[in-house]
Amino acid sequence: DNMPIDLIISPELEVARSIERQLKAPGAYDVVPFLNDEIELLSLVINEKCPLVDTSLINIHELFQENADTEKNLRASILGISRDERLFIPKKQDTLTQGDHVYIMVDKNHVKRTMSAFGYDEKPIQKLIIIGGGNIGFNLAKDLEKYQSDISVSIVENNEDRSKYIADQLSNTLVLNGDGLDQDLLDEANIKDADLLLALTNDDETNIIISAVARKNKCESIIIVNNSEYNKLKDVLGISKVVDPRKITVSKILKHVHKGKIESVFAIDNNQAEIIHAQVLKSSKLINKNIEDADFPHGLRVGLIKKEDKIIIPEKDTKIEIHDEILFLCMSDDIKKAEELFQVRSEY
C-alpha cells in the first residue's frame, strides 16, 4: 500500500512535544498519549525508592484494585518489563527487580498516583534551562508558554541572529546569546536553582558534554542523542535521560504502515515490541470472545480497553465487543498476527 499523501511528520515538533509531556511526569522516561490523550504510556525505571521492588505482578494488580468503589481503583496496567536489555511480557508470578524498565498503560487522570505508587514523588518542574534554540528548543519553549506557563524557562543559543529571532517570538522566556558550556552564562541563567537542563543542540557530543556540566552544577539533565551507540553508553557516561528523535519519528510512521484499524503505535526497546491502540470492527475475529478465549498471539498483552465512554482493566472473562478500543503490547514477531485480528475482511 502507498503511504498516504497527507502524512507529513515534523521530527523537531514531535520531539518537542515528547519532551513537553515528560515534564508533566518528572521521573518518567517516556510519556506517550493514546486514545486522544485519555490514556498515557509511562516508561519508568524501578529504583531503590520503589516500594514495589520484589512484589509480584498479581499482588500489584490486587493493590491497584483494592477499593470496593471501583471508580477509586488505580487504572494502570504493567504491559512489559525490560531487564538486562531483554524485553518480556511478565507473568502474574513475576516480581519487579531494581533496575527493571517497566512499561505501564494508565488512565491520564491516574498518572500522578501511578508515579507515586512506583516511588516517584518528584516535585513539579519550576525552572528549566534549554541549551540550543533550534527548532526543537524553540517549539518546546512555545509549547511551555502556552500549556505550562508556570514553568520559568531560559534558552541559551549560540547564534546571535537566531537568538534575536526567538526572543522576538517568545513573550515569557529569557533568551541568552552565547555558548551553552560557558559557566558564567549558565550562572546568568541561574543554573544553581534550575530543576532541569535540556541539551537540545544538533550535535551529540556537545549535548553529552553539556550533561556533564549540568551534573557538575548538581542539575538534572535530559539530552538529545541521534547516534544510538551513545544511547547504549548513557549509564557509563553518567547521562540521566536520553531522547532519541528517530524512535519518536518511526512510531509516528508505523501507524500508517500497519494493516487493520490501527489508531496509534509506539515502538519500544529498540523495536523489540510495539504499544498499539486498535479498534474492534464488526468483521473482527475477536467479536463476542472473552479475553482468555481470544486468538491473541503469545507475544501480546492487553493493557486497557475503552468500552463506549468507560476505560477498564480487562479480566479473563471480559467480553470483546464491536467498537471496543484495545490498547496492547505486541512483541515484534507477532505483529502480523495481531494485524489480522483487527483487519477489515476486504483487506485479506
What are these regions (language model features)?
Residues 1-348:
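Cytosolic regulatory regions of ion transport systems
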